[in-house]
Regions:
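Short active-site loop at a secondary-structure junction
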Residues: 53-70, 74, 78
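Boundary at the C-terminal end of the N-terminal hydrophobic targeting segment
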Residues: 23-25
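Small-residue-rich helix-loop
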Residues: 57, 298, 308-459
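A short, well-structured edge-of-sheet supersecondary motif
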Residues: 27-55, 268
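Bacterial N-terminal signal peptides
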Residues: 9-18
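Conserved serine DD-peptidase/penicillin-binding transpeptidase domain
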Residues: 29, 34, 73-342, 456-457
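Bacterial N-terminal signal peptides that target proteins for export
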Residues: 1-10
Length: 459
């Protein structure tokens, strides 16, 4: 198949734009003018544009494109994450199979599920059987290994939702909502869901002027958090918890107590999922399509990392201890199978939070082209944010003719801005990938203008 046009720039704006024949001078000129503007002259861009009918390159959250594409390659579009609830000799057992969306704030309302529905359903299943006493409660997250964060993730941000821990048993995006309310003479801090799992040290001061500013800081004691700052009326934020499997177990235990179901023994984490005596009461499924969507449309980090570990677990004897190193090696093999040279990528996580990730823009376009040509293209396409319509592109490309015609994934880290995806032009689908590194000025407008130029000038 014929390459219509392609461009690669990694320059400080002095760069000469190189094109493979035939020379697409109009687009080259427009992009060059954008990059030569006073605002962008000191910034570094990496850009790769190809016709979607032909061949082949990026980091930050654009890494999620690689993870989701590889997940479709290895797991398939019909793959389902699940969580099982079972009985075993009088004990209640909950087994996680890496579902990142159990209790997810966006997916649950879509299915008409109220907050905490899974615990209410488990209680209902027990009461339907007339069970009022349990010997023990066990939670099993061994579908994934015990490494819950990447060493390269910033230590001072591990309390943020976008650095949440990863487990075989996840709940509520592995976060808790902290709500702060000014009651006049004092400030009250509430947790949602309410639980004893997290201990709050309230250091928030009430104020009658200015804006509220509150934050949560971890301490050396797991899940003991200092909430500090000033609060004028009400303020809230998401806080990543430590040890998601234990978090789910405690929430379940507390709900059982509230419902009058007595636990005579202990609450513990235990490997039980291959025990043939398990009597399954409930299975809660989540299709991979929803996980891909939360990863790509909304940039949910937990979703992307669970895909990486699921790739590992499903390709391990015994389907156990899915891990980052193995999952990332398999993703690397997928890239090499597309003809991407090994020196053009280095993978350190699935979400792009790690600053050790290295991808050329041509690597990203190779992956995007592979998905475009695959049988599961509609699944991958629907996972992407749509310009002017939804996801992280909701506020961009709202005007015609771009609205609804740009699909892609944004990326942001300190010093990195990126956007990669597809432009559905009148002449056909075009694949693009844009990366800026360590810009000295804002590059948002320039990136959007480049995408518009790609759309306008496509053959």
């Amino acid at each position: 198949m014929r390459r219509r046009w392609a461009q690669m720039m990694t320059v400080a704006v002095l760069a000469v734009v190189c094109w493979t024949p035939p020379l697409h001078a109009s687009l080259a000129g427009r992009i060059e003018r954008i990059l030569q503007s006073t605002a962008q002259r000191e910034n570094r861009f990496g850009i790769h544009v190809v016709d979607a009918e032909t061949t082949p390159r990026i980091p930050a959250s654009n890494m999620k494109l690689i993870a989701t594409a590889a997940a479709l390659h290895y797991l398939g579009p019909d793959y389902t994450f699940k969580t099982e609830v079972a009985l075993l000799d009088g004990a209640l057992v909950v087994i996680g199979y890496g579902d990142p969306l159990l209790g997810d704030e966006r997916i649950d309302p879509r299915h008409g599920r109220a907050p905490g529905w899974v615990f209410d359903d488990i209680v209902g299943a027990l009461k339907d059987r007339g069970i009022t006493t349990l010997s023990d409660v066990f939670v099993d997250g061994t579908f994934f290994d015990r490494q819950r964060v990447r060493p390269s993730w910033p230590p001072d941000q591990l309390n943020r939702w976008y650095c949440a821990e990863i487990s075989g048993l996840n709940y509520n995006d592995n976060c808790i909502r902290v709500e702060v309310h000014n009651k006049g003479s004092a400030v009250v801090v509430n947790l949602d869901p309410p639980t004893r799992y997290v201990t709050v040290v309230n250091q928030v001061k009430p104020t009658s002027r200015g804006a509220s500013a509150v934050e949560g800081l971890r301490t050396s004691e797991p899940n003991r958090v200092i909430v500090r700052g000033v609060c004028r009326k009400s303020e809230g934020f998401w806080l990543a918890i430590e040890d998601p499997t234990a978090f789910f177990g405690v929430l379940l235990y507390e709900r059982l107590q509230a419902a009058g179901i007595r636990v005579e023994g202990k609450l513990a984490e235990k490997y039980l999922r291959h025990d043939k005596r398990l009597e399954v009461l409930r299975t809660y499924p989540t299709p991979i399509r929803e996980v891909l969507e939360r990863s790509n449309k909304n940039s949910l980090q937990v979703a992307a990392e669970c895909l990486v570990k699921a790739i590992s677990a499903e390709n391990t004897v015994g389907r156990i201890n899915g891990e980052w190193p193995h999952g990332l090696r398999l993703i690397g093999r997928y890239l090499e199978g597309l003809g991407v040279p090994a020196e053009e990528f280095h993978l350190d996580d699935g979400c792009g939070m790690s600053r050790l990730n290295r991808l050329s823009p041509a690597t990203v376009t190779a992956v995007l082209l592979d998905r475009y040509r695959s049988e599961d293209w509609p699944v991958f396409r629907d996972s992407l944010a749509v310009g002017g319509v939804d996801g992280t592109l909701d506020g961009y490309f709202r005007e015609e003719p771009y609205k609804g015609r740009i699909r892609g994934k944004t990326g942001y880290l300190d010093g990195v801005r990126s956007l990669s995806g597809y432009a559905e032009t009148p002449g056909g689908m075009v694949v693009f990938s844009i990366l800026t590194e360590y810009p000295r000025t804002s590059t948002y407008a320039a990136i959007r203008d480049i995408v518009k130029a790609i759309f306008d000038e496509a053959p």
